[in-house]
Curated annotation (Swiss-Prot):
Induction: Expression is up-regulated during wheat leaf infection.
Descriptive protein name: Secreted LysM effector Mg3LysM
Record's comment describing the protein's domains: The LysM (lysin motif) domains are small globular domains involved in binding chitin in eukaryotes. Mg3LysM contains 3 LysM domains.
Similarity comment: family membership: Belongs to the secreted LysM effector family.
Pfam families: LysM
Domain LysM stretches: 47-91, 120-165, 177-221
Record InterPro entries: LysM_dom (IPR018392), LysM_dom_sf (IPR036779)
Species of the source: Zymoseptoria tritici (strain ST99CH_3D7)
Gene symbol of the encoding locus: Mg3LysM
SUPFAM superfamilies: LysM domain (SSF54106)
Biological function: Secreted effector that enables the plant pathogenic fungus to manipulate host defenses for successful infection. Binds chitin fragments and blocks the activation of chitin-induced plant defense responses. Protects fungal hyphae against hydrolytic plant enzymes.
Glycosylation sites: 48, 100, 138, 195, 209, 227
Signal sequence, start to end: 1-16
Domain of life: Eukaryota
Note: In plants, chitin acts as a microbe-associated molecular pattern (MAMP) that is recognized by lysin motif (LysM)-containing plant cell surface-localized pattern recognition receptors (PRRs) that activate a plethora of downstream immune responses.
């Protein structure tokens, strides 16, 4: 009987003891860039969001009533056009004054009419347009259209269709090899650091989803494609 009384006493004490307050699910995550709730776009809370394949900052900002540039600022994103699957973003939600313009650089004027070194064909993906493909190769739309007279309507292309891209004569790449994707890699950065275009990478990696690459994936990567200097 004494043991039963002692057990009941201990059980009651356990229930009466003060407990640590539960962690709030709405607590703001620590931003990886700059800013804090109340200082970015008038937001009072941050929400964590894990990027999925096909996501854009514009769509994410709209979903959370945020601003593209506000999200970019908080997460230290230099180029708001490029995010990658599984990237975790801190989103300043319900912005009072969303910023969608200050971080957006004006589109460069493209004057190139051919592609350097490699990438003579391109396989159309879902959502592609002739204009977007030309931009990905850093060539003019007119030059891409001129290379594909077999297509009756440039506004009507379909996934899997192979189109031609104009290659520059007397141009080469220093090397074309394989590369193992590392954490943090995206096609845009790989193209920039190897002096090629995203379109060229897509051309050489038809079966790779450029918005959904993972560490350990192997891609074909050209390096430093350029015009050949005429011999003296």
């Amino acid at each position: 009987m004494q043991n039963i009384f002692l057990a009941a006493t201990l059980l009651g004490a356990a229930f009466a003891a003060p407990q640590n307050p539960p962690t709030s699910c709405s607590a703001a995550p620590q931003p990886t860039g700059t800013g804090s709730p109340g200082t970015v776009c008038g937001s009072t809370t941050f929400t964590n969001y894990t990027v999925k394949a096909g996501d854009t900052l514009g769509a994410i900002a709209k979903q959370y009533n945020s601003g593209v540039c506000d999200i970019a600022k908080v997460n230290g994103i230099d180029n708001p056009d490029y995010i990658k699957p599984d990237q975790v973003l801190s989103i300043p939600a319900n912005c009072v004054t969303p910023d969608n313009t200050s971080c957006v650089k004006p589109a460069p004027v493209i004057t190139n009419t051919c592609v350097l070194g490699v990438g003579s064909t391109y396989t159309v993906k879902s959502g592609d347009s002739f204009s977007a493909i030309a931009t990905s190769f850093n060539i003019t739309l007119a030059s891409l259209e001129a290379r594909n007279p077999q297509i009756p309507n440039y506004d009507l292309i379909f996934p899997g269709q192979v189109i031609n891209t104009p290659l520059c004569p007397n141009s080469v790449c220093d090397s074309i090899g394989t590369y193992v994707i590392e954490s943090g890699d995206i096609f845009y950065n790989l193209a920039q650091s190897n002096n090629v275009t995203v379109g060229q990478l897509e051309s050489l990696n038809v079966n790779v989803n450029v918005t959904d690459i993972h560490p350990g994936d192997i891609i074909i990567l050209p390096h430093n494609c350029h015009n050949i200097t005429a011999s003296a």
